[in-house]
Amino acid sequence: MTAFLNDFSKFYGTGEKNEAGQNLEEFLELYDPRKYETPSNTTDAVIFAYEGESCDSIDGLKVLLVKRSNHPSIGYWALPGGFANMREDLDETARRELEEETGVKGLVMEQIATYGDYDRDPRTRVITTAYMAVVPENAVKVQAGDDAADAVWCEVNL
């Protein structure tokens, strides 16, 4: 098997051979990535918006939601998000999916949590990393796209 990365020099460790007598190149040549079941990785973006000059209170706070246009959960409201590409960092996935589904781009988002219940998606095992941003409502314009039927700001009632 060819190594997943072209440059794996930072993974040499001390340069020792393992118990099977393999150096890193030999180990990677024989490694089978199908040996273990692997989950899919997704990201979701929790984007809050506030009215006015600053976010001094949670009164009037809104969250950005998209209406799913495909299965699973077709017609349900969800956070914007989706699957990571194989050679894409999760930060990039969060930005790409947010833009594809809502037209929103250029936000600075913070990684806030990871969700991994094994039965959270009927398609396959999915681990989701959530990102968050808080923005003035008038700073972003939302437009549904990709697999989102609609994209709207919804009031948060706590």
Report residues per predicted region.
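N-terminal leader/linker segments that precede catalytic domains of diphosphate-processing enzymes
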Residues: 1-158
